[in-house]
């Protein structure tokens, strides 16, 4: 009898770090559901993921719309089967960088609604589905993609840092809540990763990396994060939960 492929959901999986994660999971034998706010399905991305041998679907989803989460989870489960792994990757950057004293409440609310509130309640919907499932014997996990900004502050984008620090705290509490259920929870903290989001500051970080900001002296790539996530999702760390894994080339290591 052919073994069932594990099923993973990657929020924000159509580009950037999310796509790097989706590619690594597809190569690792997962069927995939990727989500995004765009209406049109990323046909080329889905074809690429399916070329690895499994199934791939797209579901439009705005994390800030809490009322739609249950329907999104139900649709994914109906199309692919029981969810084994949730990768919370989707998020937005600071709406406007600048002095904290000029931070607009509506901009703060927007980033918290997506990065923290939306992610928390989408996770709730997925975990409820996982706990209701009775047939899957595959390793199960929730993997939260945060940022070095969860611990290293940037005063000009404090709202973003707060959202990631909150997601880090959520990861710890969720790990404790789910420990006895067999659902592992991990936090992966990317550093300076080459994506569309960082393209506008690439020259700045090229110089900083060359001067040693990142001890490994290179940009991180989306695939670097993806390989870590795939290893965690496969269940090879059976006695670990609540672990924080940096993907930052040493950026977060304290130095004198």
Summary of predicted features, one role per range:
Residues 97, 212, 230, 241-256:
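Short C-terminal tail/terminal secondary-structure segment
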Residues 14-16:
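Conserved glycine-rich cofactor-binding loop
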Residues 147:
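Residue(s) in the substrate-gating loop at a strand-loop-helix junction
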Residues 97-100, 104-112, 210:
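Substrate-binding pocket helix/loop in short-chain dehydrogenase/reductase
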Residues 179, 184, 240-242:
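Short, small/polar-rich loop/turn modules that mediate ligand/substrate recognition or access, typified
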Residues 123, 163, 171:
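Active-site helix of classical SDR
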Residues 128, 176-177, 238:
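Alpha-helical segment proximal to the catalytic Tyr-Lys
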